[in-house]
Amino acid sequence: MTIEDLSKQVRKIREEKGLTQYNIWKQGMNFGTVIAIESGKNVSLKNFLKYCEIVGIDVTLEEKE
């Protein structure tokens, strides 16, 4: 999965939950960071995880086979 794939997926989930980028910003995330995450730009893992927490996305890791 690429960064672009991740960005499309998290945006899709946000939209399905009826949340806007403004809603994410209101929860304390920099608006530019929200745009960067959803545009597939490189962001810190800390910011990505914060975005996922706000949206309600569970991030899990699986060992590659």
Residue ranges: model-predicted function:
Residues 10, 20-21, 45-48:
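Helix-turn-helix DNA-binding elements, focusing on the entry/boundary residues of the two helices
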Residues 14, 24-25, 52:
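The alpha-helix within a helix-turn-helix
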Residues 18-35:
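Short alpha-helical DNA-recognition segment
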Residues 42:
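DNA-recognition element of transcription regulators
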Residues 46-62:
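DNA major-groove recognition helix of helix-turn-helix/homeodomain DNA-binding modules
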